[in-house]
Amino acid sequence: MADTRPDFFTLENGDKATLPFAADEYAGRLARLRQMMSDRDMPAVLFTSMHNIAYYSGFLYCSFGRPYGCVVTQDRCTTISANIDAGQPWRRSFGDNVIFTDWKRDNYWRAVASVLGQPGRLGIEGDHMTLAAERTCREMLGIAVLEDIAPDVMTLRMIKSAAEIALITDGARVADIGGAAVKEAIRVGAREIDVAMAGRDAMELAIAEAHPEAEYRDTWVWFQSGINTDGAHNPVTGRKLRAGDLLSLNTFPLISGYYTAL
């Protein structure tokens, strides 16, 4: 009888989606990473942060209290995702995907182990993996050496490709659209939230037009007035604008996880 409560499984549901970048972009990133791994005699790397998983696989996760990962070896790139997301992580990943279930505690690590095997040495993100996760990693994977590769990987990410620069440049264009919409919405009596929504909606429409294959999330506007301008990160409120108010605006189009701001 088939196991109806597996620890992990694969689900290739639908067709692969169009990712933020072309296949050769991801292949180049992985090639540079694998060269670094080879130089450090490191058979495998486990990424856990949103930025590195997205950078190397194209998949931008939404954790909702669950861990996510991306295991890179010399011949595979595999995202590790929660059952609640079903086939979306596979569709949005450059490479393979393994899904872990919630039936038993630490099934995430069992899924990771199914891809890793026994590498002996594993690269991790020391600036992201918690101490508790590191202990569980050692116990469940039986890995003697965990090496922090976060600084090396950050150095690799800092050198932007032409494709990345094009995406960031378009983000700046979209930020300007949001700023113009905010300006048009400013009037005495308007609430901060009303003005912010005008800018956000304008940017999301612009992103959808320019990037029809993207996922749309995380684009927002900070718009503060009067006393609320005293802190850069004060949340948007329902305060109504008054004549003579100081105003502060920031528009943030996040296209496929790439940050730009006006």
Q: Where do the protein language model's features map onto the residues?
A:
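Short alpha-helical functional segments enriched in proximate histidine and acidic residues
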Residues: 36, 185, 202-206
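Short amphipathic alpha-helical leader/targeting segments
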Residues: 72, 182, 258-259
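C-terminal helix-coil-helix/basic helical segment that borders enzyme active sites and/or dimer interfaces
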Residues: 183-190
